[in-house]
Amino acid sequence: INIHNMTLKISAGVPQGSVLGPHLWNIIYDEVFRLKIPGVNFIGFADDLSLVVTADSFSETERRANEVLKAVDKWMTENKVELALQKTEAIILHGPRKRERINVKIRDTEIQTVKQLKYLGIIFDQNITFTPHVKYIASRAGDAIAKLSRLMPNTRGPYTNIRRQILNGVANSILLYAVPVWKKAIRTARNKAILESTQRKSLLRVSSAYRTVSGAALQVLTAEPPMELLVTERAAIHERAKVEVITREIRAEEREKTMDTWQGR
């Protein structure tokens, strides 16, 4: 096999939306993830970059954070990639010893320390309770349910099975997004109540029931398991996806486990 190599100098950027663009970006951006700094993990999606810095002391955390930011900024400058400083934020995910801010800088610009940070659709808070995220997805799902309900009146609307597919499908896609990350949040009564309340709004519209009907009764009427069990089910499917290909049979198995748990209560 004859192999010929050719080097070309590129003098223009790749048009936005091109097929080749993402692949070329991944090739270039991969160098950032090869930076080796102890206690620092790189997480990236497209052009979003997250740096997770860990250390035994707060001062060491600051030192490592500034070191990695300096290295990333140097790489971006050399590769003519612009860093959006106005969009760059820092958050302290702490234990019992609380610190409100961390002193990290890029060049001469201090990075703002925030109490909540949204990354890839998930809201992280300092105490890692995920309560702000639960409130956020509950609000989004509630708005979606309200808008869809205007299109589907209780009378002269679609059949119940169609309502279930549409309303529960939309609501659950929002409520169960990225569940493996925040699944432990469902352990608190507060977060559980927020999710169950949002689910109840959807089930009221699915069943065309009176507002006085309880959430537990609506779940039985519509054959929809409690949100707490749906969170556990989705997380279990994700765990199985790490070692096997997810099929309809596997989803059916997990749903059967959910129903057994529900009926055993």
What kind of feature is each model-predicted range?
Residues 12-21, 38-41, 64, 109-112, ...:
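Secondary-structure capping and boundary motifs in well-ordered enzyme cores
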Residues 255-265:
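Helix/loop segments that flank and initiate small ligand/metal-binding modules
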Residues 1-24, 52-58, 127, 152-159:
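Short, conserved non-catalytic motifs in the polymerase core
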Residues 13, 50-77, 95, 129:
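Catalytic palm subdomain of template-directed nucleic-acid polymerases
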Residues 24-28, 64-68, 137, 144, ...:
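Hydrophobic alpha-helical membrane-association signature
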Residues 45-46, 53, 77-97, 101, ...:
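Non-catalytic, peripheral interaction segments enriched in hydrophobic/basic residues
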Residues 22-53:
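Active-site palm subdomain of RNA-directed nucleic acid polymerases
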Residues 2-6, 67-70, 82-115:
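Short, conserved micro-motifs composed of acidic
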